[in-house]
Structure formats: structure tokens, C-alpha cells
UniProtKB/Swiss-Prot annotation:
Name by which UniProt lists this protein: Large ribosomal subunit protein uL29
Coiled coil region boundaries: none
GO biological process assignments: translation
Lineage: Bacteria, Bacillati, Bacillota, Bacilli, Lactobacillales
GO CC terms: cytosolic large ribosomal subunit
Gene3D superfamilies per UniProt: 1.10.287.310
PROSITE patterns: RIBOSOMAL_L29
Length: 69
């Protein structure tokens, strides 16, 4: 993910409410589960997607922590 894409994603995440962030995190965790299952089955072609989803989950959690301060 390019820096400009990351900044855009963070801007979008900061515009969301706490409930929307929680929903987004749950969606990402389900996507990560599905990707891990595909990787274990040998059907995942783009393995970089795993790292991207993990980092996005971390970004969502960071924004949630910022809102809880």
C-alpha cells in the first residue's frame, strides 16, 4: 500500500464512528480468517493480502484507541 493510499485510508477511518470502526474491524477479521484458510488450502495467490489486512486491522485499532482517549 502506497503512502498516499495509507493516508487516505486513515482519513476515512477517522471519519467513522466507534460503532462503525467496530463493525469494520469485525469485517476485516473475517476476511483475514478466510485468507488464512485459503492460504492453508493452497488457493491463495496474493499472499501479500494477508499482511495488508493485518495492518489495516492495526490501523482500525489505533484509530479506536485515539477516540477512546
Amino acid at each position: 500500500m502506497k503512502l498516499s493510499e495509507t493516508k487516505s485510508l486513515l482519513k476515512d477511518l477517522r471519519a467513522l464512528s466507534v460503532e462503525e470502526l467496530t463493525t469494520r474491524e469485525a469485517e476485516l477479521k473475517k476476511e483475514l480468517f478466510d485468507l488464512r484458510f485459503q492460504a492453508a488450502a493452497g488457493r491463495l495467490e496474493n499472499t501479500a493480502k494477508l499482511d495488508e489486512v493485518k495492518k489495516t486491522i492495526a490501523r482500525v485499532k489505533t484509530v479506536q484507541a485515539e477516540l477512546n482517549k
